[in-house]
């Protein structure tokens, strides 16, 4: 059985060795809930990787947003390069859920845009769980949403072996049942084609395609091939082909499901008619019968997930199958930034339920649609035998349920918690400007957090007028643009960034020496003990880190936050003194803040975002792939994307020292 193997230039240091030891022992002794209280910059991800390697169990890591999940995924791949590290987040680039607004009599149809590359990574994640145990899946909270039944999915797996006798027409039928589409012209993900005695399949979870060559009904050869160039690569003795969709249903189950849906429809129509809701009854009858007709003819309909309870043969009210059900029973759960992730998991069920209830009440959906939902928090916990919560500021749930809290307060660099100062609000802007100028003179950076958007905008404008290179970071800035702005802060394009609630978890900004918190004494979500500690942590990566809180009184949250920072700083100072350590500022390549995300973005966005390869043949192959994508984009009327790809092709041709127009 393969084991986890850490590959790193670094050894465990600071508080990391004792944290790994305690957490691993806790897992071995059967502790159900543990917390790793780790400060910013203490190497929590490296600790997690070492705990996983020590206990050698399949692991699910949940992060509360896609950006942090991408960072974690990239870091885990670096620490565990010989193991299966996978990425599982929502595959929607855009998602508008189905909804009805009774006050306006307005029905909003479901609208979505699926990212094929992310869907491929999701399929790769579930495939890994069926084939090996040395698996780490980094996921967002989308992992608690419905997925196909694991055993049904497994029953559709198609094993192929060199020398095996297998009628070709049966293989084709199996592929269609597995939701693969036959297309002899457009050979892309989730499709297959047949040319004479040669069958080519593009699995839903792989970059490479497969060629299966027959001699009569015998499989003569299996080989992987590059789907763009057609180049044959490695020979394969045997392989399992997994379904192209997570929701796969046999013909028998589909027939049973249709009967079950018809029975539910009859019962629901009687209820609505008895209540005098004739319009709702007529609407439900028309919509459901149309869906049933589509399912009978095509085995699928728009919004088929709303019938998932019937298709899976589940009882009313029962929990859906999710990614958690694909893991073996002894899997380990790690919840990153648990103070944010756990409340998010808890809130998913209620929000989904309220929207669906309106659709059911007004005849847009059958009551069984309520069972197409995320797990409730209790259902989620029931599927987890052992969990580790990771946070610099554990929330109430972690504090109450953890049987062991392991602290990781000492940084490998010896850096201390920032020095804190409380200043009055009178004259705060002038004082802040002076503090900013001191940092700018030393080529250091500043983060300023306010309570309102208006205040942030005004302050940013004022600082710009005063000659300070400032940028305002607001909630409407998308993830990748936000990363660019933070990168520009590190590069010195800006010296100051002003924001509201955007300066907290997951920011790696070693150049920031000052964090200024305005209206620190306004109790609330943005100025709670947790929020203050997280915000202060942004200055903890600089050797001269300082936090200034502008307030007219010291609130309970402020006092508790300051007491905790002082406690941590004392532990750090004592450790440094005992081990004769001088704090060292972090010198991290500027690209690092962005590169971790960029590498995953390239992986999940498409070939036009990939970096330029170094080998000429790889550049030529990428050009060929891009030209295919460009034609496809133009055919789909995606002209902006086609133009973007065209520009990238011109760049690559220049790299090959070929005239952009292709003239030699």
Curated annotation (Swiss-Prot):
Membrane-traversing stretches: none
Any idea where the Helicase C-terminal domain is?
428-594
Keyword Transferase attributed: no
Q: Where does the source fall among the domains of life?
A: Bacteria
Specify the UVR domain's residue ranges.
Answer: 620-655
Predominant location of this chain?
Answer: cytoplasm
Which GO biological process annotations does it have? nucleotide-excision repair; SOS response
Occurrences of domain Helicase ATP-binding (ranges): 25-412
Motif Beta-hairpin: list the residue ranges: 91-114
Which keywords annotate this record?
A: ATP-binding, Cytoplasm, DNA damage, DNA excision, DNA repair, Excision nuclease, Nucleotide-binding, SOS response
Query: Which residues, by range, are in coiled-coil regions?
Result: none
Q: Which compartments is it annotated to reside in?
A: Cytoplasm
Describe its function. The UvrABC repair system catalyzes the recognition and processing of DNA lesions. A damage recognition complex composed of 2 UvrA and 2 UvrB subunits scans DNA for abnormalities. Upon binding of the UvrA(2)B(2) complex to a putative damaged site, the DNA wraps around one UvrB monomer. DNA wrap is dependent on ATP binding by UvrB and probably causes local melting of the DNA helix, facilitating insertion of UvrB beta-hairpin between the DNA strands. Then UvrB probes one DNA strand for the presence of a lesion.
Q: What is this protein called?
A: UvrABC system protein B
Which species? Dehalococcoides mccartyi (strain CBDB1)
Q: Which gene encodes it?
A: uvrB
